[in-house]
Amino acid sequence: MASRFPKFSQGLSQDPTTRRIWFGIATAHDFESHDDMTEERLYQKIFASHFGQLAIIFLWTSGNLFHVAWQGNFEAWGQDPLHVRPIAHAIWDPHFGQPAVEAFTRGGASGPVNIAYSGVYQWWYTIGLRTNQDLYNGALFLVILSSISLIAGWLHLQPKWKPKVSWFKNAESRLNHHLSGLFGVSSLAWTGHLVHVAIPESRGEHVRWDNFLTKLPHPEGLGPFFAGQWNIYAQNVDSSNHAFGTSQGAGTAILTFIGGFHPQTQSLWLTDIAHHHLAIAVVFIIAGHMYRTNFGIGHSIKEILETHTPPGGRLGRGHKGLYDTINNSLHFQLGLALASLGVITSLVAQHMYSLPPYAFLAQDFTTQAALYTHHQYIAGFIMTGAFAHGAIFFIRDYNPEQNKDNVLARMLEHKEAIISHLSWASLFLGFHTLGLYVHNDVMLAFGTPEKQILIEPIFAQWIQSAHGKALYGFDVLLSSTNNPAFNAGQSIWLPGWLDAINNNSNSLFLTIGPGDFLVHHAIALGLHTTTLILVKGALDARGSKLMPDKKEFGYSFPCDGPGRGGTCDISAWDAFYLAVFWMLNTIGWVTFYWHWKHITLWQGNAAQFNESSTYLMGWLRDYLWLNSSQLINGYNPFGMNSLSVWAWMFLFGHLVWATGFMFLISWRGYWQELIETLAWAHERTPLANLVRWKDKPVALSIVQARLVGLAHFSVGYIFTYAAFLIASTSGKFG
């Protein structure tokens, strides 16, 4: 009996119903709840699993390199990045016969292929890779790293190599190692690669293992470094007519502060990027020497926190007790890490298009759209996860005794004020924004567009002007020619910035108007509402006004309607579940806005966005409906085209999304009855009744059904929009 799944829970493995399987899957990664789990084993299991995670990442990136080298057209693309379409991989078995083979044979390939919209071609080209052999070398190196990671994971589960809990809880050593070792040294190594390999390659000089010790990255070598004349490395930059990948118009500078974009590739200057990574390396290597470990010098985080009591007693005992609370709670640490990573991922989305780091990325519109959307969705899921683990921290790890009257306890004590303020902000944003959209919609419908309420975003325009955008005529800071900052900028720092910000061919500080003002506030509504649900779920996780003592209920009990006095106010899991819908909703608005604004910009008809984005029908008709026309046309009576796969995915995405509602809007008793009817019929049907099962079938629990519904809703929603985004963009721009 002991061998039944799940092995980690005796109680669950003896459950006679199908609940055993579902609960087993649900709690497989909740190591804390497993039988015989000690704190030490918990830390060791998580530590070892990190190596498995790394192995998967290395294997996946290796696969990207390998398939492009084997089936792609990297070398041909490098000869003409603007006109050759990059191939991701071949399609072995294109369905629907000869028309499909013809539709998907493109990019100079001999058979059907998929086009790459991930930006890897641009990235590899920028960092100095040029041949398929380079790609194969990279793939092999990553497979070796992957194997080493797997071995390391296995090794750290062996008795001799298992770290002790005290090692995991040594915060200072870990910070030093992560700051100096991981961030600092890896940034320094990346600077080295850019200076020794990528920058020479961008100037037509091929540096590889056979010559990298003999080719100087700078004609002066290390002389200026030791002489303290570092400015020599910034002299003689690439000229504005530099042809990327050749010596034509190339300079010799390696660390610069030019600002703006390389005129041909429309991407940041490689020498600026190298300079940036060197600065990061210096800062982080210094930061990683700040904390006290074996030598008795440096900061102790615990001492800093204990001493940090704000003046005037306004925050009670300040940060006392926080060190142990955080250091002993994996959920708190995970929550902090996810919050940071979520913000960083969203910043990647924002900067990837506005300051494109890779050569020719800015001219590959579909890839830009795909990268923006991808990173925003990832950010949304990571951020909601931060609050989920924050809530679990309050239920499982928070000790009121240890945190008496410190900042954490005071957060809980005035949670009503926090929640009501967020609620007020959400209501204000929601009613006013919707009110403006609906008013404008009605005015358009009644044929009086001049009666719309159109608000210019003057504060945002002022901020753009302060950064140097001259269009609005504000004449302030960098947009004022008399300003000292303006004059310094011409020569000392970032001389290319003002050209870039006032050039309409890039996405830096896009011109904004009333449509942007409205959608900005719609997005603000989404962000505040998502935050409200998440913050309330976490702050009310242990107890709320309706149910002050819910700690023992755990994290994932359901809100199950009006029974027991109404429990919808009190489940932390339910708050997370509702917040994910709002998160998806918000990111929908964000990506719709980004995409529509950009396709009108790229097509040279920005007026369409400006005029149609101020009322609801404009969004529905001129963005969604108009841009889905090619998609719905992937198959037609005349055969098929290369968008057909996206047309199919668009339909399939809607199907998956709609299936979600079957689980979301359902009554558990109905399912139980249906299951028992099916089981009864099965047992009485000849032949079918030869197959028996041991577990009694029971309906999913409320929480499980919600999770399954949410998963279908999310996956279907993302599939549908991904297909729409890629097809509508690639259909227009090839």
Swiss-Prot record:
Function: PsaA and PsaB bind P700, the primary electron donor of photosystem I (PSI), as well as the electron acceptors A0, A1 and FX. PSI is a plastocyanin-ferredoxin oxidoreductase, converting photonic excitation into a charge separation, which transfers an electron from the donor P700 chlorophyll pair to the spectroscopically characterized acceptors A0, A1, FX, FA and FB in turn. Oxidized P700 is reduced on the lumenal side of the thylakoid membrane by plastocyanin.
Listed SUPFAM superfamilies: Photosystem I subunits PsaA/PsaB (SSF81558)
Subunit-level organization: The PsaA/B heterodimer binds the P700 chlorophyll special pair and subsequent electron acceptors. PSI consists of a core antenna complex that captures photons, and an electron transfer chain that converts photonic excitation into a charge separation. The eukaryotic PSI reaction center is composed of at least 11 subunits.
Binding annotation for chlorophyll a B3: M662, Y670
Enzyme class: oxidoreductase
Cofactor binding note from Swiss-Prot or TrEMBL: P700 is a chlorophyll a/chlorophyll a' dimer, A0 is one or more chlorophyll a, A1 is one or both phylloquinones and FX is a shared 4Fe-4S iron-sulfur center.
CC per GO annotation: chloroplast thylakoid membrane; photosystem I
InterPro entries, per database record: PSI_PsaA/B, PSI_PsaA/B_CS, PSI_PsaA/B_sf, PSI_PsaB
Source species of the chain: Marchantia polymorpha
UniProt catalytic activity: reduced [plastocyanin] + hnu + oxidized [2Fe-2S]-[ferredoxin] = oxidized [plastocyanin] + reduced [2Fe-2S]-[ferredoxin]
E.C. code: 1.97.1.12
Protein name: Photosystem I P700 chlorophyll a apoprotein A2
Entry's transmembrane regions: 46-69, 135-158, 175-199, 273-291, 330-353, 369-395, 417-439, 517-535, 575-596, 643-665, 707-727
Family: Belongs to the PsaA/PsaB family.
UniProt subcellular location: Plastid, Chloroplast thylakoid membrane
NCBIfam families: psaB (TIGR01336)
